Amino acid sequence: MLDIQLLRKDLDGVAKRLADRGYTLDVAAFSALEAERRAIQTHTEELQARRNSLSKQIGAMKGKGEDTSAVMAEVGGIGDDMKASEAKLGEIQARLSDLMLGMPNVAHESVPVGKDEADNVEARRWGTPRQFDFEVKDHVDVGTPLGLDFETGAKLAGARFTMLRGPIARLHRALAQFMIDTHTQQHGYTETYTPYIVNPEILYGTGQLPKFADDMFRVEKGGAENTVTQYLISTSEISLTNTVRESIVDGAALPIKLTAHSPCFRSEAGSYGRDTRGMIRQHQFDKVEMVQVVAPETSYAALDEMVGHAEAILQKLGLPYRVITLCTGDMGFSAAKTFDLEVWLPAQNTYREISSCSNTEAFQARRMQARFRNAQGKPELVHTLNGSGLAVGRTLVAVLENYQNADGSVTVPEVLRPYMGGMERIDAPAQAS
């Protein structure tokens, strides 16, 4: 959530910055609510002052033995008026809150202004795409003989679900283990196991609700009269970041660095017809997530560090990639600045997103009321960051395509072999004669 003081101080400036993100701020609606809030608040303060004055008058009158019934009746009437004003003020503040919950974060000044992904800026590349001396297959054709089973996944759960079997399932698990081990042993993160189902207020904290309810899978429990609605997580960023919800952290404890391997569940409501073949866009996929909770003055250094941590995974796997600075119009709702990592997929002859690392500054912290005690001992909002380290399924796709061989086998990247029992390559099972 944006700082309401920023809106009150520079409403037109904020509206311009949000317009750069493709969001139209209803300046008239906000201004009208603010004017109404100020009027009611002023009226309430006047009533309070009048009641205080009358209370003193009653004390003086009683000291003189005078009749106070008329004055006390007026005080009672003021009390009723104050309750009505406070109720109205609460209603206005709730409407302001609803309006602000729908506003995205403002972009950092270093973010390039643009409309969509066409305006993103490439920051750098790493690695050279492999030159194949045979016809390259995509991950579906490479993986299907090795245990990638889309047919059974669809039979069990419908489109955009996949079954993995045998060595390819083991390779998928090996990738996640390798990522977690790297982040915990080399990058300083604490491994965390989180709930996969969370309460609605948790999603308000990180910004998925109310705007993106259609992208979430919802579950309900209880009978008709006591139904409780919860949500499957679309990323473990949600649960990891909310660990500091409604708390004041000791400044000496920062930075807090957490990582988790979890399934992620997304309805992909706006993705009809996109990436319908293969594992690129699934309703259920695994991801290793990185989250950092830091002091405000260190958050952009932390963002660079986090991007480096995601890059390290790709470099150790020997997968060519590029780093993209997202423009204002392509960033996620909560982000102030985002870098995407895109891995090379030879069958598509292009780079595809495999990680997104974002600094949300105080946007999520304000929604969660997550604070730390600064050097002066005063509570201050933390900054929160999140990043994929990496999407496991898409990394599997990249390994299958970049490490495929002419005979249909797949070479196991060297760093994964300890997790694969020393296996150097995955071969299709021999066909029965």
UniProtKB/Swiss-Prot annotation:
It is an enzyme of class 6 (ligase). GO terms for biological process: selenocysteine biosynthetic process; seryl-tRNA aminoacylation. Pathway: Aminoacyl-tRNA biosynthesis; selenocysteinyl-tRNA(Sec) biosynthesis; L-seryl-tRNA(Sec) from L-serine and tRNA(Sec): step 1/1. ATP binds at residues 266-268, 353-356. Catalyzes the attachment of serine to tRNA(Ser). Is also able to aminoacylate tRNA(Sec) with serine, to form the misacylated tRNA L-seryl-tRNA(Sec), which will be further converted into selenocysteinyl-tRNA(Sec). Belongs to the class-II aminoacyl-tRNA synthetase family. Type-1 seryl-tRNA synthetase subfamily. Keywords: Aminoacyl-tRNA synthetase, ATP-binding, Cytoplasm, Ligase, Nucleotide-binding, Protein biosynthesis. L-serine binds at residues 235-237, 289, 388. GO terms for molecular function: ATP binding; serine-tRNA ligase activity. Its EC number is 6.1.1.11. Consists of two distinct domains, a catalytic core and a N-terminal extension that is involved in tRNA binding. GO terms for cellular component: cytoplasm. It comes from Burkholderia orbicola (strain MC0-3). This is Serine--tRNA ligase. Homodimer. The tRNA molecule binds across the dimer. It holds the Pfam family Seryl_tRNA_N. It is found in: Cytoplasm. It catalyses: tRNA(Ser) + L-serine + ATP = L-seryl-tRNA(Ser) + AMP + diphosphate + H(+); tRNA(Sec) + L-serine + ATP = L-seryl-tRNA(Sec) + AMP + diphosphate + H(+).
